[in-house]
Amino acid sequence: MEEISDPKPNALEQVLPTVPNGKCTAPVQMESLAVDVQKVSGEAKVRICSCWCEIVRSPEDLTKLVPCNDFAEDIKLFDSDPMQQEAESSIGIPLIPKQVTMSHNHDHESGSEMVSNEVMQENHVIATENTYQKSDFDRINMGQKETMPEEVIHKSFLESSTSSIDILLNNHNSYQSGLPPENAVTDCKQVQLGHRSDDAIKNSGLVELVIGQKNVAKSPSQLVETGKRGRGRPRKVQTGLEQLVIGQKTAAKSSSQLGDTGKRSRGRPRKVQNSPTSFLENINMEQKETIPEQVTQNSILESLTIPTDNQSRTYNSDQSELPPENAAKNCNHAQFGHQSDDTTKISGFKELVIGQETVAKSPSQLVDAGKRGRGRPRKVQTGLEQLVPVQETAAKSSSQLGDTGKRSRGRPRKVQDSPTSLGGNVKVVPEKGKDSQELSVNSSRSLRSRSQEKSIEPDVNNIVADEGADREKPRKKRKKRMEENRVDEFCRIRTHLRYLLHRIKYEKNFLDAYSGEGWKGQSLDKIKPEKELKRAKAEIFGRKLKIRDLFQRLDLARSEGRLPEILFDSRGEIDSEDIFCAKCGSKDVTLSNDIILCDGACDRGFHQFCLDPPLLKEYIPPDDEGWLCPGCECKIDCIKLLNDSQETNILLGDSWEKVFAEEAAAAASGKNLDDNSGLPSDDSEDDDYDPGGPDLDEKVQGDDSSTDESDYQSESDDMQVIRQKNSRGLPSDDSEDDEYDPSGLVTDQMYKDSSCSDFTSDSEDFTGVFDDYKDTGKAQGPLASTPDHVRNNEEGCGHPEQGDTAPLYPRRQVESLDYKKLNDIEFSKMCDILDILSSQLDVIICTGNQEEYGNTSSDSSDEDYMVTSSPDKNNSDKEATAMERGRESGDLELDQKARESTHNRRYIKKFAVEGTDSFLSRSCEDSAAPVAGSKSTSKTLHGEHATQRLLQSFKENQYPQRAVKESLAAELALSVRQVSNWFNNRRWSFRHSSRIGSDVAKFDSNDTPRQKSIDMSGPSLKSVLDSATYSEIEKKEQDTASLGLTEGCDRYMTLNMVADEGNVHTPCIAETREEKTEVGIKPQQNPL
């Protein structure tokens, strides 16, 4: 064997293109290769042997060449198979294996020749005579465009693997004495395959990979941390070199190499099947995941080929040795026709030897497996078998494989990857008593050919079927329960009868609540819902008929299969041969299925097994005890329920026709037995009222069941209560306004209007006026009346003086009340009252004030507020209103006088009651109105100058602008609000008083009005009041001082008393300035 040294190793790269077809196969070619190398290198010495041609650059860097005879038979030169030829022809470019250097390791005891991806700056080439099949790399790279997963080892070239590929080396390790140091194989060039792949394969982790050995040395940095799970016990993960073999359906995945595959957010994890043939497909085609870093550039796994019989042997050398860690980090990637863009970084295994029966392990070599956050760790089985992915399930690890099979809730599913299903007789048994990280893997297997290898795939359909069976179990239980709780016809009848009886009881309780008199007859006046009571009675009637139908159905069911009457003799006995089953009609009898006769009234017999449920022999009652069929038992239960609820007396032998026979007869005749007798109605809608009917009195005097009688009996009682209240002077709470007929003539009620007051009075003042009018001057007792009573008389709904002697008529059908018309009438009345009060009360109050205190006047008097009325004008307006309502002029005058006297008396009484010392400081307001030619003068509220200036402005414009008001306020030292109130009061007085013009004229002529006293004893007052009113006022004139008459001069108090007349007017309160009150009264306009 000759040695050739090459001082120019870089020049050897020029030799590579000269190799025919990219291969070094024959010795002739090796000779030509040596010549070419010598020509290029110049100083290189070429030595040619039978099988090797090696170039070295110096004597110190020599590599021993192994003779061809030392190789295994299947590694020698052989032709490619048809599949490889087809792949080669399809690509058109021969595949050149990756740069691989062979180094002789003297320290390894097994003596195997190691192939490592070691490349230093020195480049060496070793040519072998074996040709490699390009189809092997086609399976890896052609059409796949996938990246190698991480943690898949720095692959030393597996020259002893099953594929025979001619290795063309660009770089050769010159170290003779063993494996290169760490980090010596980090930057390799990529060997181009037939076409470029998108991802470059970066492999790191396994520094040494020796095939064919029986020992596998492992260290913590070499093994994969597998089986980690966040929750639940870890999954059993089996790792091995079998997962690196291409050709199966499943691939080894790692969390740092592959994206998390098979993840499911909920439920149990999906089984991820990775085949060796799709090893690279699972990386790039399906996962499309980014390969993490921490991986050195890989030497190509040239040993990942199809495991055939001729390819299952390994290349061993006596002097081979495992390299140290990280020895394969700087290797150049050979380009195999396609160049990957992304790199797959694979780390994890530092040392791995396949093929031995024993696997040497140490704590630093074992996988950190089975870690769990809680609970005991899962037993993780790691071994070489998982590197051969024969099964559809893949070995998974937390650091190398994507976390597959994760479950968001619940404990994890047990994933068992059996060694036999992984394609070999591998026994992975964890040692007991040791930590989960120290697991022993017993492997007694050898690589088998593909022809002998049959993948045993788990049946997914079985798993799905098991899951479906688990889900169907509750359904079966529900069906069984339904069958057990199956209800027959008799049970339905019993249940329905119980429901009907319950509803009847409910409706009866409802009727009893309104039919009783209650304690001391208090329930007689209870409001009774007539329609609801009718509905309840109709409901009870219908339920009884349904109960009758249920008994009819029950008897019909019991009559099926009955024995004919002719079969019984005179004593009621029947021959046993004539007995047949009522259900099946058969007469066949066996010892275990005899016919049993019912002891009820149905005269039927049943087979033991025809009954539902079947009647067993041990449950048959003795002869002295009777046995009833299900139909007779149901009827007995129904009769018992009916008798207890409705207090009936029905027997078992009775027919269904006896059940509620009266109700059935009434229904047949179209009548309802449950009428409304004894239940008075509160229904106010008397649509059957006929005002022209001849027998109204007969209806009223009818029996107690009449609804109208009860209604009007209660109405008469209410009237009596009202009369009692009136006799005690208490106001009535009756406010029924819905019966007022505004178009009706109320001339007969004028007398009542004149004899009553609109306000409640507690004193006897001025009541003789009305008595004198009624009895022609005779003094009568005090008369107390209530405004409600008067209002009822005005509305035409009450004649209390008639008492019980007056005939009672049914209620009228009242039409809708015209409230607008009613409001107009009341408003006109109120205007008349205010006019009279404004003219006469000022005279009476001011006169009494003068008698008590002399001619003193108060600063609180307001000249601005002048309430006077023209009697002629108001009388004429009232006459017109009265004529519209059909009143006569005489009655109008009488009514007007009575109203005047009544209101005068009311105001005097009000002042007497509310008189206090606080009112003594006040004086009567100056009305400034001439009554019967008299004058009165007083100081104005704002002063004479201010009043005169305001009157001038009022004469110019009654509705001044705001700017004018502000100027007046600034001129007179008043507020804008005071000026506005003065104009408002003045406008109202101007509309309702005829003397405003004369006052304005007086102020224009600078004439100060003077106050004149009124002689109460003279004819001046009589000219205002008529004789009847005057006589009463003169009678009570002496008591005004003692009653505090002078204290009521405040206009606001007058307004409070007038407010009792109703909702027809409201007060307009002026502001208070320096404890001086100015009050104006304005009638409210029609709100409608």
UniProtKB/Swiss-Prot annotation:
Polar residues composition bias: residue spans: 272-282, 303-320
UniProt biased composition (Acidic residues): 705-718
Renumbered residue ranges of the record's region 2 X 16 AA Asp/Glu-rich (acidic) repeats: 678-744
Disulfide bonds: none
Gene Ontology CC, one term: nucleus
GO BP annotation list: defense response; negative regulation of gene expression, epigenetic; regulation of DNA-templated transcription
Keyword Repeat among record annotations: yes
Signal peptide: none
Ranges of Basic and acidic residues composition bias in the record: 788-802, 874-901
Entry's transmembrane regions: none
Sequence repeats: 140-152, 173-199, 205-239, 240-274, 283-295, 316-342, 348-382, 383-417, 678-693, 729-744
Segments for region (2 X 35 AA approximate tandem repeats (type C)): 205-274, 348-417
Protein induction: By pathogen infection.
Region (2 X 13 AA repeats): 140-295
Stretch list, region 2 X 27 AA approximate repeats: 173-342
GO molecular function, one term: DNA binding
Residue ranges flagged as DNA-binding region: 226-236, 261-271, 369-379, 404-414, 935-994
InterPro entries per UniProt: AT_hook_DNA-bd_motif, HD, HMGI/Y_DNA-bd_CS, Homeodomain-like_sf, PRHA-like_PHD-finger, Zinc_finger_PHD-type_CS, Znf_FYVE_PHD, Znf_PHD
Alphabetical keyword list: DNA-binding, Homeobox, Metal-binding, Nucleus, Plant defense, Repeat, Transcription, Transcription regulation, Zinc, Zinc-finger
Its biological purpose: Specifically binds to the fungal elicitor-responsive DNA element, 5'-CTAATTGTTTA-3', of the gene PR2 promoter.
Family the entry assigns: Belongs to the PHD-associated homeobox family.
Protein name: Pathogenesis-related homeodomain protein
Species for this entry: Petroselinum crispum
Taxonomic lineage: Eukaryota, Viridiplantae, Streptophyta, Embryophyta, Tracheophyta
